[in-house]
Amino acid sequence: VFEHGTLDVEVYAPRGRDPQTPHTRDEVYVVMTGTGTFVNGDVRFRFGPGDVLFVPAGVEHRFEDFSDDFVTWVVFYGPEGGEAATDRSA
């Protein structure tokens, strides 16, 4: 939907199951509609409209048991390896 420098904004609306694999950059989800369970590493929690979810680069994550109307913005940003990789080299 939108790209500028290291910023990439998309709409994500999986149906049935969420086939995601870890990404190379940090990401933020902003839930627009729907509910479900978000798995972020070893943590599982319920989400709903308006929730903001952060996933560091390289972390296993997925949406489970989500409603048919689930839609979220996903924002990828920063360097490959995530901001934490940059912080380690400073």
Give the residues covered by each predicted segment.
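Ligand-binding loop in jelly-roll beta-barrel domains
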Residues: 58-83
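Short, conserved beta-strand element in jelly-roll/cupin
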Residues: 23-38
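Short histidine-centered beta-strand/loop micro-motifs
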Residues: 1, 17-23, 40, 45, ...
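Short acidic-glycine-tyrosine-enriched beta hairpin
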Residues: 42-57
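A short glycine-rich, His/Asp/Glu-containing loop-to-beta-strand
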Residues: 1-20, 25-26, 77
